Amino acid sequence: MFKNAFANLQKVGKSLMLPVSVLPIAGILLGVGSANFSWLPAVVSHVMAEAGGSVFANMPLIFAIGVALGFTNNDGVSALAAVVAYGIMVKTMAVVAPLVLHLPAEEIAAKHLADTGVLGGIISGAIAAYMFNRFYRIKLPEYLGFFAGKRFVPIISGLAAIFTGVVLSFVWPPIGTAIQAFSQWAAYQNPVVAFGIYGFIERCLVPFGLHHIWNVPFQMQIGEYTNAAGQVFHGDIPRYMAGDPTAGMLSGGFLFKMYGLPAAAIAIWHSAKPENRAKVGGIMISAALTSFLTGITEPIEFSFMFVAPILYIIHAILAGLAFPICILLGMRDGTSFSHGLIDFIVLSGNSSKLWLFPIVGAGYAIVYYTVFRVLIKALDLKTPGREDTTDDAKAGATSEMAPALVAAFGGKENITNLDACITRLRVSVADVAKVDQAGLKKLGAAGVVVAGSGVQAIFGTKSDNLKTEMDEYIRNS
């Protein structure tokens, strides 16, 4: 049971990355357009704001498509089914909810009693994915043959969405009310506590690749803002981009991604044995620059996550504290993908106290460096370059690595599902015992996570290319 649950959660996490991948361009368009820069013509700002806003306004539908594709090996029919399911589900609720609640449609809309948001998109995507996997090979009588196979999937998904819409009309109002109450508490009443908890748990979920699921309600659901054009935005990211002065609570990520973790990487480099210092320095400096520029932290985190768990626990606590610090000091900046220098500069149009970030960030860097340096030495932690024995990595070009990677996962017969997100290969296997974890690390994996039948190997931003090469190798071998 646990094996299947973790494997499915892995797929959910991966499927959510597709909708998230559109945030950078949408965020830049909306953020820059809403900032009304004096050097940008008004018509250009308006076009950019409307273009970016259209993406955020359709995020539930985009999430529906992403979830459907994530569970069906990117089959386009499931995406069509998700669109059909979402549209039908929403319209069904619009008709049934007033009858169930005995309230006018206007009041239901004002109280968001039938507004499922991105969660409704995820539900619709799950319906489409289930129906696709269940019916894509269905055979019908000859006179209905045109509707057999994959053509049947959007039809049955739409019918299932009607039933789902009716059920949600009964069960969603109390759920929606609870979500709305949490949203108000987190966004307006006690954001210091809410985002402190968010930051700590988010880092705790990184080892399992499940942090994308935890991010969704905070990034895309909490809070509400209506701009001058009447567009309504939910979630901290869309609200900030649209110009909401109360948004930007996710700014704490800049402190530990741009300053804290790069300092930790330098501490690991300085703590390596003299004979390994040059090699470790190259790896750590590269990882530090990646974190500073793009906010991608896994190459650093997985270098100490398993060999020195105490360091990761402290890191998670410091990451959690970064968010309340920024909120209490009134520091606000925008993020679309992750908290790196690119986001920091490009999305600064609606920011507050931007000058404080490098000052507080320098303090965070000192704390990280000191804690890591002292504990590594005092506890003799086996961080990179301090191991008793070292193996040279055999990593090469992605096309050259594919056969070795397939072999390390136990061979193509052992691989039941192959996927990748931004920084890790996500592989489901028939027999975990056949997976060569040491071999994966020799090939360049920063870490390997095994839970149930799911295996994650962290190869950084080249993971998706590795997945493509492995797919091609498996098909042609």
Swiss-Prot record:
UniProt domain PTS EIIC type-1: residue ranges: 1-388
Gene Ontology CC, one term: plasma membrane
SUPFAM superfamilies for the chain: Glucose permease domain IIB
Subcellular locations according to the entry: Cell inner membrane
Keywords noted in UniProt: Cell inner membrane, Cell membrane, Kinase, Membrane, Phosphoprotein, Phosphotransferase system, Sugar transport, Transferase, Transmembrane, Transmembrane helix, Transport
Topological relation to the membrane, as annotated: Multi-pass membrane protein
Residues the record marks as active site: 421
GO biological process terms on file: D-glucose transmembrane transport; phosphoenolpyruvate-dependent sugar phosphotransferase system
Gene3D superfamilies: Glucose permease domain IIB
Location of Phosphocysteine modifications: 421
Cross-referenced InterPro entries: Glu_permease_IIB (IPR036878), PTrfase_EIIB_Cys (IPR018113), PTS_EIIC (IPR003352), PTS_EIIC_1 (IPR013013), PTS_Glucose_EIICBA (IPR050429), PTS_IIB_1 (IPR001996), PTS_IIBC_glc (IPR011299), PTS_maltose/Glc_sub_IIC (IPR004719)
Residues in compartment: Cytoplasmic: 1-14, 72-79, 133-151, 212-248, 301-309, 377-477
GO terms, molecular function: D-glucose transmembrane transporter activity; kinase activity; protein-N(PI)-phosphohistidine-sugar phosphotransferase activity; protein-phosphocysteine-glucose phosphotransferase system transporter activity
Domain spans labelled PTS EIIB type-1: 399-477
Entry-linked CDD domains: PTS_IIB_glc (cd00212)
Catalytic activity: N(pros)-phospho-L-histidyl-[protein] + D-glucose(out) = D-glucose 6-phosphate(in) + L-histidyl-[protein]
Entry's transmembrane regions: 15-35, 51-71, 80-100, 112-132, 152-172, 191-211, 249-269, 280-300, 310-330, 356-376
The EC number(s) this enzyme carries: 2.7.1.199
Topological domains, Periplasmic: 36-50, 101-111, 173-190, 270-279, 331-355
Entry text on domains: The EIIB domain is phosphorylated by phospho-EIIA on a cysteinyl or histidyl residue, depending on the transported sugar. Then, it transfers the phosphoryl group to the sugar substrate concomitantly with the sugar uptake processed by the EIIC domain. The EIIC domain forms the PTS system translocation channel and contains the specific substrate-binding site.
Protein function: The phosphoenolpyruvate-dependent sugar phosphotransferase system (sugar PTS), a major carbohydrate active transport system, catalyzes the phosphorylation of incoming sugar substrates concomitantly with their translocation across the cell membrane. The enzyme II complex composed of PtsG and Crr is involved in glucose transport. Also functions as a chemoreceptor monitoring the environment for changes in sugar concentration. It can also phosphorylate mannose, methyl alpha-glucoside and 2-deoxy-glucose.
This protein's name: PTS system glucose-specific EIICB component
Species in which this protein is naturally found: Salmonella typhimurium (strain LT2 / SGSC1412 / ATCC 700720)
Gene: ptsG
